[in-house]
Regions:
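N-terminal leader/linker segments that precede catalytic domains of diphosphate-processing enzymes
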Residues: 1-83, 88-137
Length: 137
């Protein structure tokens, strides 16, 4: 592992072990129109689907990278968006970490056995698509 990556991993492990800013940070980044439309991070619909995404960091040539994907163009609410690799929970997934790892393998070709899971960020409810998303780091 590179000299750059090891201190980064230690810091991320430390930070994930503490209190995360969660919904406060999410609201700080939310579009202003959310409140006017009655969208809420606090009210997750009972029929919300579960999803997982992977924030994957990797070193290459003394730099850190994080892969993002460009979603295809279609008629849905996430058409053409840039995001972390991820998607919906499959009944064959053991949990949402498995979902994130499976989707990352399908979307960017990273084998789950090559990933060191450090922890999770605060789940995010995506009102527009009715998904409760668990980010895995």
């Amino acid at each position: 592992m590179s000299d750059l990556f090891e201190p980064f991993l230690r810091q991320i492990r430390h930070d994930l072990g503490g209190t995360l800013p969660g919904k406060e940070a999410q609201m700080g980044m939310a579009p202003l129109f959310r409140a006017r439309n009655g969208e809420s991070y606090d009210t997750v619909r009972a029929d919300a689907r579960q999803g997982g995404v992977l924030a994957l960091f990797y070193p290459q040539r003394d730099r850190l990278y994080i892969p993002l994907i460009l979603r295809p163009t279609y008629t849905g609410v996430h058409s053409g968006q840039v995001g972390f690799p991820g998607g919906g929970f499959d009944p064959l997934d053991t949990d949402l970490t498995a979902t994130a790892l499976r989707e990352a393998y399908e979307e960017v070709g990273v084998h789950p056995d090559e990933v060191i899971v450090l922890g999770h960020l605060t789940p995010l409810y995506v009102y527009a698509s009715n998904y409760l998303v668990q980010p895995t780091v």
